[in-house]
C-alpha cells in the first residue's frame, strides 16, 4: 500500500509538471507529438489531434515531446518555429506548475491544521537573552537578518547556523503590534567530556574517540567496553547516563575501567572542557488554526519555506555541508513517502492526509526549484539559451546547444545512478 501511495504522489507531481509544458505548448501553437507518464515501453497509448497520450512501464518520470524540439527545423508547428517568448513560457511552465501544485497542497494543509508562528514560549530568567528584553509571547520576525515567517524558518536557520560564543545575535520581535529590536550574545554552556562516541548497544562500547580529548590520550581503543567510573559499575549505556546525571564530570581526573578481549584495564582520564554557545529561550513548534484569506497567506508562506529550504540545502551541498550521499532520487523519495505513511497510521487519518499532502507539496516545490537550475538538460539550462536568444535576437548555434544539453544529460544520468545506488544502500 505504501509503495502504491508513494508512486501515485510521485506520478501526480511529474504529470502536473509535464502538463504545464503541454498547455503552454498548445497555447503557443507548438505541436506536441507525445504526452506520457512514466518511462520505458508503452503500456497504454491513444492518439488524438496529432498527440499520442501514453502510459509507460516505469512510473518514475514523464515527458512532453514537442515537434522539432531538438532539431534546427523552424517550420510552422515546431518548437523552434514558435516566437522566442512563447518558447520561454513553454519551458518555464513546468516548474511554475510545480509551484502552483505545491501552493494548492499547502492551502489544504493550512486549512486542516493551521500554521506555526515563531512565538516565544519560555525565557530563562538569568540568561543574556532575558537581559536583552525577550519576553514570552513575543513573535520572532527576524533573526540575524533572516526573515522569519514560520517557526520552521527559525529552526532551519539555527540548524544550519549554530550560534558562536563571541557572536552578537540581532533579533526583531513583534510585541503588542510593534517591532522591538534586540541584541545579545549567547550564553555559554561549559561541560566536561571523556571524548568518545558510544555504539548503539546495551553495553558501553566505544564506537570512536574524539581526537585531542580525554580518552584519546589513554590506551582506550574503539571496540573497548567501559565497565566502571571511579569504582561505580556500569552495566549499560543507560547506567552511564544516570551516573553523569548524579556525578557531572569536572576538570578533576577520573578512573575508568575498560574491558578488551576479556581482560580489564584501568586508566586515569582528565575530562576535556567543551564550550557551547546556547540561546536560553524556547519557541512554539505547534500549529495555530486560521481561516479566510489568512489560509491563502500562510499557504504562500508554506511554499516560500519549502523553496527556501531547498535553496539552503543546495547551498550546503555546494559548500560541503552536505555530500552526494545526502541526496535522494526516486527510490529514496518513494521510500521516504512510504516510511512517513507507516509512521502516520497510528495517529489516524487526519495525520496521514496532512503528512502525505506535506510530502507532496515539498516534493513539488523541490522539483520546481531543481528544474529551474541553470544546468544543461534541465528546464533552467534551456531557459538560459532561450534568454540569450531573446537578447541577441538570434539563436545560439543549435548543434552547440544540443551538445551542451547532451553532455549535461550524461552527467545527470551518472548522478542519478550514484544517487539511486546510495538510496538502495540506505534501504537495505
Features from the language model and the residues they span:
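Small-residue-rich helix-interface/hinge motifs
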Residues: 2-75, 370-392
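Alpha-helical transmembrane segments of multi-pass membrane proteins
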Residues: 10-14, 65, 98, 102, ...
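Alpha-helical transmembrane signal-anchor/signal-peptide segments
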Residues: 28-33, 113-131, 135
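Internal alpha-helical transmembrane segments
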Residues: 54, 58-125, 407
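Functional transmembrane alpha-helices
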Residues: 78, 82, 193-217, 225, ...
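PDZ/PDZ-like peptide-tail recognition elements
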Residues: 88-122, 156-160, 164-210, 255-257, ...
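Conserved PDZ fold ligand-binding element
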Residues: 129-152, 215-238, 303
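Final/C-terminal transmembrane alpha-helix of multipass membrane proteins
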Residues: 403-423
